[in-house]
Amino acid sequence: MQDRNFDDIAEKFSRNIYGTTKGQLRQAILWQDLDRVLAEMGPQKLRVLDAGGGEGQTAIKMAERGHQVILCDLSAQMIDRAKQAAEAKGVSDNMQFIHCAAQDVASHLETPVDLILFHAVLEWVADPRSVLQTLWSVLRPGGVLSLMFYNAHGLLMHNMVAGNFDYVQAGMPKKKKRTLSPDYPRDPTQVYLWLEEAGWQIMGKTGVRVFHDYLREKHQQRDCYEALLELETRYCRQEPYITLGRYIHVTARKPQSKDKV
């Protein structure tokens, strides 16, 4: 099994993910969490790794705040687009770009990083535990992992609301090989277990798009966006809504020493 490379659909990826209210909402909720993490880590400038960072939307915003950001991605096209976007925003001096898969990034880093962003990648990799172990190895003790993954429970709920009963009964097989539908939707309980077994201390969990995708009237996603964002913000960090999110964002700390877990 190979990990997904988006060279063939980079433009479609950008348009479908970030050119919609679902992308706008995803970034808004994500940055609420990231702002809290940054506040807790203090005023110092951080070394940040965006592993599988794609076009760099989050990495560039981090660089605009003065942090030094390393972005790696398996897709050469995504790296090129990220470089162009960084130039346009005037933050190229705060960024480094590495063309490699997330699980290979350790060989490109000389010193550990303070914060790792690993967003919407875990659902595309064939060996998730290996990737998480690599990320552990390049994060300094006391550093933080920001992990966002595609939620298998959210996928099931979305299909049930749509009335796709046969598809759910068949186990929700992937319909096309080369699409934006993730290869490996993740069970959140399994992901939490992987993190805890590796030694991470989970700090917080947030459901991302806990209501947006389930609206009967799709025009409300756009026409009522501000009200929707307010309600998503109110409920997204409590159950059962966390587990209904289309994505789940987990923040986890690497202890100062593993024996403190």
Swiss-Prot record:
It catalyses: 5-carboxymethoxyuridine(34) in tRNA + S-adenosyl-L-methionine = 5-methoxycarbonylmethoxyuridine(34) in tRNA + S-adenosyl-L-homocysteine. S-adenosyl-L-methionine binds at R26, G52, G53, D73, A102, Q103, H119. Keywords: Methyltransferase, S-adenosyl-L-methionine, Transferase, tRNA processing. It comes from the Bacteria. GO terms for molecular function: tRNA (5-carboxymethoxyuridine(34)-5-O)-methyltransferase activity. Its EC number is 2.1.1.-. Pfam families: Methyltransf_31. It is an enzyme of class 2 (transferase). GO terms for biological process: methylation; tRNA modification. The keyword Metal-binding does not apply. Belongs to the class I-like SAM-binding methyltransferase superfamily. CmoM family. Homodimer. Catalyzes the methylation of 5-carboxymethoxyuridine (cmo5U) to form 5-methoxycarbonylmethoxyuridine (mcmo5U) at position 34 in tRNAs. This is tRNA 5-carboxymethoxyuridine methyltransferase. It comes from Escherichia coli O157:H7.
